[in-house]
Structures are given as C-alpha cells and as structure tokens.
Design a protein with these regions (language model features):
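Active-site gating/metal-coordination segments in enzymes
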Residues: 212-213, 220-314, 363
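Unchanged
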Residues: 40-65, 73-129, 137-148
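Conserved N-terminal beta-strand and adjoining loop/helix that marks the start
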Residues: 1-19, 41, 72
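Histidine-centered divalent metal-coordination motifs
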Residues: 164-170, 303, 335
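Mid-to-C-terminal alpha-helical segments outside catalytic/metal-binding sites
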Residues: 149-163, 173-209, 213, 384-387, ...
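Conserved, mostly hydrophobic/aromatic
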Residues: 164, 206, 233, 262, ...
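Short, well-ordered coil/turn segments that N-cap beta-strands
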Residues: 156-159, 210-214, 239-245, 265-268, ...
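Catalytic pocket-lining loop regions of alpha/beta-barrel enzymes
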Residues: 268-269, 279-389
C-alpha cells in the first residue's frame, strides 16, 4: 500500500526564516518532542497543492498559498510505502496557532520561526522524510564538497567507499567520453559528463568528498586490450593511495592468463562489461578465467543488466547460467541490474556470493530515462542490505556526486542501510581497516 503526504515549508516574515512545529512527547512516536514541518496525509485523489491548503487549516489554523515543490522522498514504513513531498507556502490569512481542535490527526504542541536548517537535523536523523527533503534542498545551495560532507554527517559516515569509479589511460578515457558526448548507440540519450578534469584533479575531488577507497574500473571493447589495461591498472593503484587495484578481461584465449597474472600482481577487483564487450559470459573460452576468480574470491563488478541499452548477452539469464556453473563467484551486479532489478535481486537472494552496486540507481536522470527502481522492491533491497555497495560511475556521470548520494538517501531505507552501503559492506568485502 502507498500512503502519500505533503509537508509545508511556511516562509516567515523575516528573510530566510521558516515555520517549525514540535510534536507531542508521545512515547510511542519515533519523532516525539522533535521540531519538524507541518504535514498531512493526502486523502484518496487529493491533489498535493490542495493538501498544502488543508495542512494550513487543519494543523496551523491559517490560510496558505502553495508555492513551489521542493522535492520528494519515499520510505518503507513496514505496512505501507510512504511517499512525501515538501512544498513552500506563505500565510495569506490568520495567525498560526497550535494545537488545533481535530484530535483525529497528529497535532502540534508548539510552533516558532527558525532561521537555521539544523533545527530539523534531529528529526531527519530519526527518520523524518519532510526534514530530510528540506535539508537536501537547502544543501544544494552549498559547494558540492560541503553537500557531500552534510550527507556524511546526516548518515553518520566518517568516510565513503565507492566500488564503481573509473580511471583509465587518458587516451582511452577521452575516447570513452567522446562516445558519451555523441550519445552513441550503447548510450541511447544525451549524457553531459560532469567531471572532465585531469587525473590528479579527479583523484583529489574524490578525496575532498571523503572517499577513502575507490576503484579504477577498466574494460576492453575488443580482444587484445585487457593485458595492457591491467598493466596500467597495476601502476595506477601503486601510485594512488586509496585505489583498490582493479583489472579486467575479455572473451579471448588469453583470458585465463590475463586474469591469473592480474591476481598475482595483487588485483582486488575486476570489471566485466557484457554490454560494451558484447560477449557471452558463458563462452567456453572464459571458463578457466571464471574458475580462477571463483577460487581466489576476487569480486567482479559486472555490467550485465540491459540498461541503458540492451546487448546480445545482457539480462539475468546469462548470469544465472554462469552462476549455475560457478556458484562460488563473487559477482557485484552493477547498477542494481538495471532495468531488470527484480530478477537480479532474485539472483542475489539465491546466491550468497552475489552482491549489487547502486551505480546511477534512484537518480532523476535514470527515472527520466524510464528505468526507475520499482518502489515495491525496496523491502527486498533493504533485506539484502549487507550485500549492497555504493557505486557512482564517477567521473562519467551526468549529474553531481552529491546528487548520487542524496538519491540513495531518498529511498528512505534508513541510516543503518546507508552506512552499510556507503562504507561498511565494502570495508568487509575488501578487508579495509575501519
């Protein structure tokens, strides 16, 4: 069941102020006694803006004029999925007064105007969606590093571990970014890349965001590339503190030798890109390589979902067949298996060695592309929380790093889930000291 609500950011008489209300000290209420925003649950068929007007009347005793929509978030509340939007509003009649007389709905015991958004921090920490949406909207006015720092504070994270970032030889990176710029056949839509700086600046950017460990995922698009990419990856990891030594392979006779050499050199993660590579993961030429990876227990970040454009060997079927032959593989399903989310969740539920990364999931860019994560699958994703890892696709993303993190926050899966996804699960997987 889906329950929809609206919360109201009532602008105060002085610039930068807004109205906050305090909930009753009800011991059964997780938000008891905290300051938050006035909100109402929408009736069936009720328009959000009509809900804003009703919130003013029922909760504050005033007439409100709805303004702009600040944002939306959702949260699994067990018996229902809560979807909540924040709206700006101004008072056009009356003076605020609490509590109002309707005892059938939550009333408030105190109100005041506040200027500091931090007044809502405790409510956000206790799970208030309306407080979180407001704080996210407010944080977008900050420099990006401060936005990421604010996300980390809200989530209780000292640092972040990102298992899906890309570093590669500059010539290859330029070719990859040119393909994105041209919205090539495997992209399917315009894709304005956010981070185009030189290599050292990109590394420094991640560190400024508090990213303590990250990958340098490489992937060949034709035979004969993997060995040289792996040599570059080994060198990059050796000269870049915090980089998890990354390697790759292709469906070719040298695959097992390439994988074996990379493991001997200390590779800690591999990338397999079935869409770009265009090969079948069940090609017999790959069997020895998969066997080595399974025996070594090295994770393989695998782009196997059919997004943004399907390939000949994408989708859950080829991966299910691969796992039937190599059940010990540690596969990290990139992009949560987008758009076949449910099928890949099923594979993760069946195979304890299968993990998922969050790359691009939940962002407006993906939602607008027609591949949103189904809200009904959020409980399954929550239950797999110890096998979900943060991925971002930095630097080749068409929005900011902060946008990607805040999109995860909007899932409403909670701070424990966020901490596990953005740090703890990867720390365990890669044996990174806390």
């Amino acid at each position: 069941m889906i329950k929809r609500s609206v919360a109201v950011v009532v602008r105060g008489p002085e610039a930068g102020t807004f109205l906050v209300v305090r909930r009753p000290d009800d011991p059964g209420d997780p938000l008891a006694g905290v300051w938050g925003l006035p909100a109402v649950t929408l009736a069936d068929g009720e328009d959000e803006r009509a809900g804003v007007v009703r919130a003013g009347r029922d909760k504050l005793g005033v007439e409100l004029a709805p303004g702009g929509r600040l944002g939306q978030a959702s949260a699994d509340r067990g018996d229902y999925l809560l979807v909540l939007a924040d709206y700006e509003a101004t008072i056009v009649g009356g003076s605020p007064s609490v509590p109002q007389s309707d005892a059938s709905v939550t009333q408030y015991v105190e109100w005041r105007y506040a200027a500091d958004p931090a007044v809502l921090a405790e409510a956000a920490a206790r799970g208030s969606l309306c407080a979180r949406v407001f704080l996210e909207d407010n944080s977008k006015k900050l420099p990006e590093a401060e936005r990421v720092a604010a996300f980390r504070r809200r989530s209780g994270l000292d640092t972040i571990i990102d298992v899906h970032t890309h570093f590669m030889p500059e010539r290859l990176l330029a070719a990859v970014q040119a393909y994105f710029d041209a919205a090539g056949p495997l992209i399917g839509r315009p894709w304005p890349i956010t981070y185009r700086e030189d290599e050292q600046t990109r590394v420094s950017t991640l560190r400024a965001f508090g990213v303590a460990a990250f990958t340098a995922l490489l992937y060949p698009h034709k035979p004969g590339m993997a060995r040289s990419l792996n040599e570059w990856g080994a060198d990059f990891a050796a000269r870049t503190p915090g980089c998890l030594h990354s390697a790759t392979f292709f469906a070719e006779p040298s695959a097992a030798a390439d994988v074996g050499r990379a493991i001997e050199q200390g590779a800690r993660v591999f990338k397999c890109h079935l869409q770009v590579g265009g090969f079948d993961p069940n090609d017999p030429v790959l069997d020895p390589a998969w066997g080595l990876l399974a025996e070594a227990g090295v994770p393989v970040v695998t782009h196997c979902g059919s997004g943004p454009v399907a390939g000949r060997f994408t989708g859950p079927g080829p991966i299910a067949r691969l796992l039937a032959r190599h059940p010990a593989l540690r596969l990290v399903i990139a992009h949560l298996g987008m758009p076949e989310y449910g099928e890949f969740l099923t594979l993760a539920e069946r195979h304890p060695g299968v993990l998922l990364d969050t790359t691009m999931a939940f962002t407006p860019f993906i939602d607008d592309a027609g591949a949103p994560f189904p809200p009904g699958e959020l409980p399954r994703l929550r239950d797999l929380g110890n096998r979900v890892l943060l991925g971002t696709d930095f630097p080749n993303i068409p929005y900011t790093y902060a946008d990607a993190l805040e999109a995860l926050e909007r899932t409403g899966l909670g701070q424990d889930w966020l901490r596990a996804v953005c740090h703890d699960n990867a720390a365990v997987l890669f044996e990174i000291p806390v």
